[in-house]
Amino acid sequence: RSSAHNWAPSSGCAARAAEKADLILAVGTRLSDCVTGSQSLFRNPDVQFISINVCGHDGFKNGALPITADAREALKSLLRAAKAAGVKPRTGYLREIAAERKSWRAKAEKAGRQVRGKPLGQGTIATVISEEAQAGDTIIAAAGTQLMAAHKLAVSKPGVEYQIEFGYSCMTHEIAAAIGVRLAGRKGEVIAYLGDGGYMMNPTELVTAYQEGTKITVVVVENHGFQSIYGLQMARAGRDFGNEFRARDRQSKRLAGEYLELDFAANAASMGALTWRAASATELRSALT
């Protein structure tokens, strides 16, 4: 569960580097709420921004010096200019970042392992999806703890594309986006990764996928509701407002009873989907292949 929305879905290494940086080079980003931890990520009082973006509106955000250009070509030009000017990274800084990266990788590997006797966790699910992805595959996430886990634990691979949409949490984007990716001609597997709360907001897009004959893989995580928002509400207000799939408690009159027994696989099957249930990393790998 998340505690609030003032944190960013980056690795710990990247977050600490951003906290100290006096210059941020923003490449193709809208510097939105989730990316910047609601603008709390950058702690240096003298921080300045340079933004490379094809969209002029986004290029000016945070008072950045805008470079309206293709990201790859702009970076090539900047690298040539930096070399010509004699710009070099500080040796001490490189050592510091290397140590932070090593520490983060150790944490990520631990988060990706399933603990014996415990339910399949978000970190393990995101790690398995990343490990099973092959060149040509597309992974889509857009909201909640799935979005954060996918972003933090993904390992870059040639030809594997992550499409993560999060100006704010964008529940219901995932399945529709997966259909769009398939219709656009992507040849590999297309995986939509979402929680049960987001799934229940728009499961009928499975019917659209069926109608269009678009083969997609939908990984629905049983979170018993909107746990990211639950965490935010508990942190900010000290109580939640019915964001978990619980029965109403007769004494308190609140939705604080037992978790509801909901069969999401049966729901998806009723709309034409082939379904598998996975309670372990091994079962999830098998379902994905």
Please state what every model-predicted region is.
Residues R1, A99-A176, V181-R182:
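Active-site diphosphate/adenylate-binding microenvironment
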